């Protein structure tokens, strides 16, 4: 796909909306727009948001999960990039579920709902999935503050990879290729001082 002059939708969380960037112009969406001469980078990032549905939905913007926001994005865009999963691990209430799930109430189900919805809405257009980056507490099955044990971050990454493979969607596996590892002191100091946001 020729990126120059194209419109790309970016659906994501705090990293997409620019937390950790020193200015709006330094958000990865804006950097990509300049580097590839996009006509427009539509930023649909909401800090703290999750792919899967919360059990109790509040009026807080971050409780508007990716599945809820699917139909709010510019349908005329030439491509879509989805970057998420870290908040599902960190503080999401949804259980993991099983591969057969198709409801946003589980992480598996939400991944299916989102990816199939994107394929239906953006027929013939590229939809790219980005896996979560490593984070400081990625091995804690309680995430940031869950009162119950669910799974480490690598399990959420694995589900994203599995469901994307099922739908034939390309994946940029940032967990495996970003070079960011907050458990390494030098990497954390240079690339993500808070252990989460680059």
Predicted segments, located by residue:
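Active-site phosphate/pyrophosphate- and oxyanion-stabilizing loops and adjacent acidic/basic residues
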Residues: 30, 116, 158-161
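Catalytic His-Asp segment of secreted/periplasmic serine-dependent ester chemistry enzymes
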Residues: 132-198
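Conserved SGNH/GDSL esterase-like catalytic core that processes O-acyl groups on lipids
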Residues: 2, 7-9, 15-109, 197
């Amino acid at each position: 796909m020729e990126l120059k002059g194209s419109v790309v939708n970016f659906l994501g969380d705090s990293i997409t909306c620019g937390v950790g960037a020193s200015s709006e112009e330094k958000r990865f969406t804006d950097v990509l727009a300049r580097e590839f001469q996009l006509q427009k980078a539509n930023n649909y990032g909401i800090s703290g948001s999750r792919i899967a549905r919360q059990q109790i939905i509040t009026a807080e913007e971050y409780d508007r999960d990716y599945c809820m926001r699917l139909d709010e994005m510019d349908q005329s865009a030439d491509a879509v990039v989805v970057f998420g999963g870290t908040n599902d691990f960190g503080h999401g209430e949804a259980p993991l579920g099983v591969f057969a799930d198709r409801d946003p109430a589980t992480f598996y189900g939400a991944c299916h709902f989102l990816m199939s919805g994107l394929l239906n809405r953006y027929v013939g257009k590229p939809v790219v999935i980005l896996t979560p980056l490593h984070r400081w507490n990625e091995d804690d099955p309680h995430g940031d503050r869950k009162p119950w044990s669910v799974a480490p971050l690598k399990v959420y990454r694995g589900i994203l990879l599995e469901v994307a493979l099922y739908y034939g969607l390309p994946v940029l596996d940032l967990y495996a290729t970003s070079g960011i590892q907050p458990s390494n002191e030098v990497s954390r100091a240079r690339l993500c001082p808070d252990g989460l946001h680059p």
